[in-house]
Regions:
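Asp-box/BNR beta-propeller blade signature and adjacent active/binding-site loops
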Residues: 1-217
């Protein structure tokens, strides 16, 4: 994807496949900027770089793929803002065959008191919901001691820790990782194994990007 901003900067967004050409695995969403109409390009900027398992061998990674860009004009609601829409997959092999292929249906969200919340599940398939400020509630609508990491301001590391789960302040894994081999970094709670739609934006011509927001429901 490529757009020209209201200031004349070219921004190109792409999948950075770090290990192989397939549509799964360790894939980051990156952008490059040009301020001279494409004659030269700056170094890639990581927008989203989700976690992989320590035993990654081609598939054991959460990832984002297929970014789309829209640039607002100076007379837009958010003058000069650049929006990015991207598909997000928890640890999986996309729609391909295999144990961790994307095969669950639905949005991955449930309604609580009229609001949509991301559903999380434990190993016994008990349902939880991810609420405001990263708080996690159980099926009986009781707040638990689980909290998902929140970010303040823009993160220059591609939101690598997005999805990190803490229990009583202790890190217990990442909700977007799921496989259970030795030394895994999977959290005890995880969302449905389906595709999600994330939205991010930049207000400085693509130099920094907001924390992606899941707009799936």
């Amino acid at each position: 994807a490529m757009v020209t901003t209201s200031k004349g900067t070219l921004i190109a967004a792409a999948d950075q496949r770090n290990t192989h050409w397939s549509d799964w695995g360790n894939i980051d969403t990156v952008v490059r900027r040009s301020t001279d109409n494409g004659l030269t390009w700056e170094e890639p900027i990581d927008v989203i770089d989700l976690k992989s398992q320590s035993y990654f061998n081609g598939t054991q990674s959460a990832y984002t793929i297929d970014p789309a860009l829209i640039a607002e004009g100076e007379n837009g609601k958010n003058p000069g803002r650049v929006w990015m829409l991207v598909d997000m997959m928890p640890e999986s092999t996309n729609g391909s065959q295999g144990t961790y292929s994307i095969k669950e249906t639905g949005t991955g969200y449930v309604k609580v008191d009229g609001k949509d919340y991301l559903a999380l599940y434990d190993k016994d398939n008990n349902q939880y919901t991810l609420r405001e400020n990263g708080e996690v509630f159980d099926k009986e609508n009781r707040k638990t001691d689980y909290v998902v990491k929140q970010f303040e301001g823009n993160d220059k590391q591609g939101y690598h820790e997005k999805g990190d789960l803490y229990q009583s302040g202790k890190y217990v894994g990442n909700i977007y990782l799921r496989s259970a081999s030795k030394n895994n970094d999977s959290a005890p709670l995880h969302p449905k194994q389906t595709c999600y739609l994330w939205l991010s934006y930049s207000d400085d011509d693509g130099m920094t990007w907001s924390e992606p927001v899941d707009i799936t429901p």
